[in-house]
Amino acid sequence: LTSFGETLYTRGLPGLTMTDVAKNAGIGRTAVYNYFADMGELLVAYALDETERFLNELRAGLEGIENPIDQLAVYIRLQINDLARRHLPPGPAMRSMLSPESYAKLGKHVHELQMVLAHILSAAIAENYIPKNDIRELAMLVHGSLSSSAGRAEDAPDEETRERQILNTIRFIQMGLGARF
């Protein structure tokens, strides 16, 4: 899975083959096929592994933080960092590559991640930190902003600029949701 992630990061998904992954890992292609039947299965395994890793990191980051606006800041920061370090194709591209069963398996895992954001947003509304609104719509706006921000943070010339971009993104999303501090 590490080799797949490295190869995906450097080459992107279009045209990526099991041979490329095996070569990067320094093993024969047959060894990869012993674990994964095809590229779709490998992609799902990688995505599930990365999502689980991210969920654990997110849970640890949120531990002890009670204010939902502060939780949202942690969520945004970790998402930007995660999106910058792993390049999974967006949902529609993955759907076209995967069988309906594989896509559904991935969807269950992604749903767990979406529920973390939904919980944060629900708490922010319940505690009057943001105005009442549709949670799904708010989550889509948050994720849309995150997707466009991840590339900017990744391309920052230095750590200070990157940190400023992340803080600006956090504040932009919080203010866009109508946050009261």
Give the role of each language-model region:
Residues 1-4, 21, 46-50, 54, ...:
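Generic hydrophobic, amphipathic alpha-helix propensity
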Residues 3, 7-41, 45:
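Helix-turn-helix
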Residues 43-47, 51, 103-114, 139:
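Amphipathic, non-transmembrane alpha-helical scaffold segments
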Residues 45, 49, 56-85, 138-142:
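Hydrophobic alpha-helical connector segments
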Residues 61, 90-97, 149-156:
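Secondary-structure edge/capping motif, primarily at the C-terminal ends of alpha-helices
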Residues 74, 115-127, 144-181:
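C-terminal peripheral helix-coil segments that are non-catalytic and often amphipathic
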Residues 77-116:
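Short secondary-structure transition hinges
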Residues 131, 135-139:
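Membrane-interface starts of transmembrane alpha-helices
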